[in-house]
Amino acid sequence: MAIKHLPKILIARKNKAEVNHCDLKRRVSIKIIYGLGNPGSAFVKSRHSLGKLMVSMYADSMAFPKNWPSTKENLTLVLSTSYMNDSGKQLKKISNDFVRKVSPLDKIVYVVVHDELELDLGKVKLRLPGGSHRGHNGIRSCQEFLGKESFYRIGLGIGRCESRNREDVSDYVLSKFNSNEMKLIETDIFHKFCNILQQLQLSIET
C-alpha cells in the first residue's frame, strides 16, 4: 500500500522564514513501533498479544539491542508492559520522552501493532491514522491518550470464534496459538508484516 501523504499532526512544522537548507538536511523521521499485548508469561503467544509477539520477532530478525525500548538508527521498538486497557498511558509517556529529545523539525511517526478479530488469521492490514478502534481496548486507550489521528496501525488477523458471547470471545482472544498457527505466524504472517512495515517506512521518508 502506497502512502502519498502523512497526516498533518505527524509533521513538526516551522515558519517558512525560519527554515533554511541546513535545517532541512537535519530533518529526521523517527519511527516508534509499539506492540500491544498483556504482560506476564501467562499471555505469551496468546492471540490478544500477537502485536507484542510480532514486534519482538522483528527485533530478533533485525538484530536490535536486547533492552526495551530498543533503538536502532531512527527506529525504536516498544513492547507494551501494561495491560491492554492501559496501553495508551505507556505510549503517551514514550511520546512525551521523545518530544523532549528531538528537534522541532523532526517528525515522530507512531505505528501501533495489534491483533484484530475482524481479520482472519493470516491477514495483515495497514490502517491509516483515524478510524474506529473496532472494539479493541488497546487501540481505544491509545486513541484516548495520544489522539485518534496520531498513529498508524498494523492489524494482525486472529479471526473470530463462532460464539458472539462476550465471555467466549474473551476466552478466545486470551487463548494461545497452537503449533500449526505458530508456524504460520513465524513464516507467512511475519513476512507480510515486514513487507507492510517496510512500505510504510519508505512512504514516510518520501
Curated annotation (Swiss-Prot):
Any GO CC annotation of this UniProt entry = mitochondrial matrix
Name the predominant localization: mitochondrion
Q: Which residues bear the site annotation Stabilizes the basic form of H active site to accept a proton? A: D115
Which compartments does it reside in? Mitochondrion
| Enzyme Commission identifier(s) | 3.1.1.29
Q: Which GO terms describe its biological process?
A: mitochondrial translation
Q: Which InterPro entries does the entry mention?
A: Pept_tRNA_hydro, Pept_tRNA_hydro_CS, Pept_tRNA_hydro_sf
Q: Which UniProt keywords apply?
A: Hydrolase, Mitochondrion, RNA-binding, tRNA-binding
Q: Which sites are catalytic?
A: H48
A GO MF term? tRNA binding
Swiss-Prot/TrEMBL catalytic activity: an N-acyl-L-alpha-aminoacyl-tRNA + H2O = an N-acyl-L-amino acid + a tRNA + H(+)
Q: PROSITE patterns annotated for this entry?
A: PEPT_TRNA_HYDROL_2
At the top level of its lineage, which domain of life is listed? Answer: Eukaryota
What residues does tRNA bind to?
Y83, N85, N137
What function does the entry list?
Peptidyl-tRNA hydrolase involved in the recycling of tRNA-Lys from diacetyl-lysyl-tRNA-Lys and is important for mitochondrial function.
Please give the family membership noted in the entry: Belongs to the PTH family.
PANTHER family documented for this protein: PEPTIDYL-TRNA HYDROLASE (PTHR17224:SF1)
Q: What is this protein called?
A: Probable peptidyl-tRNA hydrolase
* Organism lineage string: Eukaryota, Fungi, Dikarya, Ascomycota, Taphrinomycotina
Q: Which gene is transcribed and translated to give this protein?
A: pth1
